[in-house]
Amino acid sequence: MNATNTSAFVKHLLNRFFIEYKTRDHSGIYGYTQKLFAYNSNKIENNNLTLEQISSLFDSGILPKSQVPYQVKDIEETQGHFIMFNKMLDTLDAALDQQIIKSFHFELKSGVFEDRANDYAIGDYKKRPNMISIHQTTLPSQVPEAMTELLNWYHAQDISLETLAEFHARYEIIHPFQDGNGRTGRIILFRECLRHDISPFIIEDANRPEYLEALKAYRQDGTVTALTTLFQKEQEFYFNQCEYFFAE
């Protein structure tokens, strides 16, 4: 895709998203993206629902019979992801800021009983330190300043795929929320692609090892080459999936 084709693709995609979202049409690219995004982004975080189960939940609000018991949290977070995606569309006219990011977290997590029972901050930054595996993240008291610095840096850039890769890697190091950082981070990526005429993408769970290694590479040496390469691969996959819905 060249720049002209990408811009036309994003414009067409947005047009279909809003038409289908407002008319509650789940049969097109909006519904497909909702299902694919919720499945992959949650699966990366060890959600156990299959794509078929998520599709049924989105289309009808009903889960099919299963030999394996459903975990309530998996269902709650999947429903939250659907709502977070809609919030992303609703806020596209506004420049990314901390309030928008917090609103994504609220939509994702406000219906999750376990998080509320654990007294996690919902729609607000974390109150307790957390880690990524064995790696320390930004302390709760330092998160507001760290997020301000990150957003100030971001808005001073000419936005490109490399810029988004660095933003995402830095966001994940801050880990501003008690839980849900990866999913809010990935919805931000999709949103900012749409806002800046960059072909959007969904990180597939099948590419989770590559994704985690790319984030690790940034922590170790500050490079985003591996992450950008992954984003490009995911762009191609999502674009190819979208072509079906745009065929005459």
Task: Identify the meaning behind each predicted range.
Residues 1-179, 183-248:
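FIC/Doc superfamily catalytic core
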